[in-house]
Amino acid sequence: MTPPVGNNPPSGSAIRLAKLMSTTRAPSTRKTNSVFSAYAQGLKRKAEASSSRIQNVRARARGHGCGRTSPSSSTAEAERHFIQSVSSSNANGTATDPSQDDMAIVHEPQPQPQPQPEPQPQPQPEPEEEAPQKRAKKCTSDVWQHFTKKEIEVEVDGKKYVQVWGHCNFPNCKAKYRAEGHHGTSGFRNHLRTSHSLVKGQLCLKSEKDHGKDINLIEPYKYDEVVSLKKLHLAIIMHEYPFNIVEHEYFVEFVKSLRPHFPIKSRVTARKYIMDLYLEEKEKLYGKLKDVQSRFSTTMDMWTSCQNKSYMCVTIHWIDDDWCLQKRIVGFFHVEGRHTGQRLSQTFTAIMVKWNIEKKLFALSLDNASANEVAVHDIIEDLQDTDSNLVCDGAFFHVRCACHILNLVAKDGLAVIAGTIEKIKAIVLAVKSSPLQWEELMKCASECDLDKSKGISYDVSTRWNSTYLMLRDALYYKPALIRLKTSDPRRYDAICPKAEEWKMALTLFKCLKKFFDLTELLSGTQYSTANLFYKGFCEIKDLIDQWCVHEKFVIRRMAVAMSEKFEKYWKVSNIALAVACFLDPRYKKILIEFYMKKFHGDSYKVHVDDFVRVIRKLYQFYSSCSPSAPKTKTTTNDSMDDTLMENEDDEFQNYLHELKDYDQVESNELDKYMSEPLLKHSGQFDILSWWRGRVAEYPILTQIARDVLAIQVSTVASESAFSAGGRVVDPYRNRLGSEIVEALICTKDWVAASRKGATYFPTMIGDLEVLDSVIAAATNHENHMDEDEDAIEFSKNNEDVASGSSP
């Protein structure tokens, strides 16, 4: 008996499915959201497919059930009706409350099923859900810098598949590995480690992004034990580490942590490697000096170690093809016995012959010692005997150190006026010798709105510039020192300078500032200083002459003492330094005429004529030695010569010769250079760059400028230029043998020069000084702009006189 069919409610699974579908269309998602809409449509299609499968199963059951009607047919019909109602409501974009839907399902009248069997519905294919497209994952592993992904289509059992393979980028390597994401990168790393000696940490260094693209700073490299050992010993040289650093426990552990099998040896082996590195760099420098086309200017100086060992330091200077000033230390020898002129000359000549540059010398800069005078005389004779072809028979060879001259002049002047600054020395010593008194001074400085971090320098007997620095700092803290005296008169009244003494200190400070600025300017080694000597020394001479008639007696006494020493060295100064000033297009001959008229009065023309003869003699020497010396013919006449060679008419040929002789203009680079107006330039001026751009216009004068401007007017760097006690070799190196000391100092200088501008390596002899002195030079230039204007006015007056007009 068939049970009655009524309004049966839908099954629980259908209700849960309907609730899930309704929640996907909650009121909070009424805004058009494509993602959730696609998801709801997918659930709808799955529900319809499930309902269709249920109907098929029930139909098959009825077909095998002897014509009995399934009691659940009405239930299936109600479920199908319920799903259609929910789908229609979702399609209309309306939200349905799940509780209301349940009530509607319960009370909705259901149609009565008929007893006849229902036709079996055809099974509907289940629609496939469209999967959202995924963004391709970016390869972040460093192995892909050495492999390239390629897609390969393969066929398996009649079906085609796409496989991804990674091919090695190294030349002549055909290795490839599966590159799908689930395969990983271990195989790639193992291949790089075993076949190409690349391990983790060496594959790629940090990269930077430029316009969205990764740019590697360096390329992968193969580990080289020889290169690593060279870097280690180069670090010992450049940073002046002790040799036994290779035996330090924690340093060895550090190296072993980087590479356990690194062959770090003992200090004896380190010394051997350093000597080998020195010989290697020496051979490179020898080949480089062989190709230099210009002449060399040299400096020779004596150094002292803590064990009183004397060393001779010989440095060569030249201007390369790019018109950059170069310098190299070519000798650092231990000189035994007395430093006689003969011994010094023999050592210097041996060094020049050793480097094969004895025939390319131009000048030698030395200190003002009696032994050096004898040494220079012997060196010139030795070089002439070897046919070294010295310029003008050595007339420009000996150059006296300008900084040493200024040092001697300043010391003689300070020795006379030492008593006038005794109180300043006393009060500076008082506040610096006690921390409590220094704190009191700094408290007074704060009350006067002064910079407490500036500090006060103290006077040192062997450094004349320390007196200048002490006066500068004391004058800066003058308000604080006066305030300190007022707060404790019992302690400071006797040692604090009076108002008149402060005025005297200010006057001395202004006088010494001229010496300080010029010494700092002429001590540079990174720029040409030869063209700055003549103008600077003329300014000093002019100032000393003015101080000799100063209203204050103390200044006059100081000026007289300075004048005696200055005149002694001014008379024997090298004429080549005046030539260097002549080669400065801002001054030429006009500046020399200006100062000669100022110093010699009406007889200045005699001195100017002597100077011009020296210039012409130097020009003739280079003209005779230059294989490419220009001829005194114009370009038009040269083209005429070519025409004459091709012309067979003798009469016409003679006529052309007559025309050429008639309008031929004898041209001379020297006369052309002197006839051109002065270069108007303010601020810093790069004289080497200026001559570099005039090579085609003045081929002979540029050769002269290239040799003359390489002259060093100082034998020391700025940090030791003010010392009267000489230079001292580093105490950590003085126990080493002279051979290894030379290797360390020379190699450091050569390597640092080859890396010029990349890294600064502090050195014991100051070979790589910073160009801070250029700022002082610019300030000094501004202070003397009036004199430069006088020189230009003097030039204009001369031109007016030459043209027949009155000034």
UniProtKB/Swiss-Prot annotation:
Disordered as annotated region, ranges: 42-140, 785-807
Classification via Pfam families: Dimer_Tnp_hAT, hAT-like_RNase-H
Residues covered by region (10 X 2 AA tandem repeats of P-[QE]): 109-128
InterPro entries per record: hAT-like_transposase_RNase-H, HATC_C_dom, RNaseH-like_sf, ZnF_BED_domain_contain
Sequence repeat start and end residues: 109-110, 111-112, 113-114, 115-116, 117-118, 119-120, 121-122, 123-124, 125-126, 127-128
Composition bias type Pro residues, residue spans: 110-125
Record has DNA-binding as a keyword: yes
Biased composition (Polar residues): 84-98
GO molecular function: DNA binding; protein dimerization activity
A biological process from GO: DNA recombination
UniProt keyword terms in alphabetical order: DNA recombination, DNA-binding, Repeat, Transposable element, Transposition
Other facts noted in the record for this chain: This protein is coded by the transposable maize controlling element 'Activator' (Ac), which is able to activate chromosome breakage at a specific location; it may be the structural gene for a trans-acting function required for transposition.
This protein's name: Putative AC transposase
Organism this protein belongs to: Zea mays
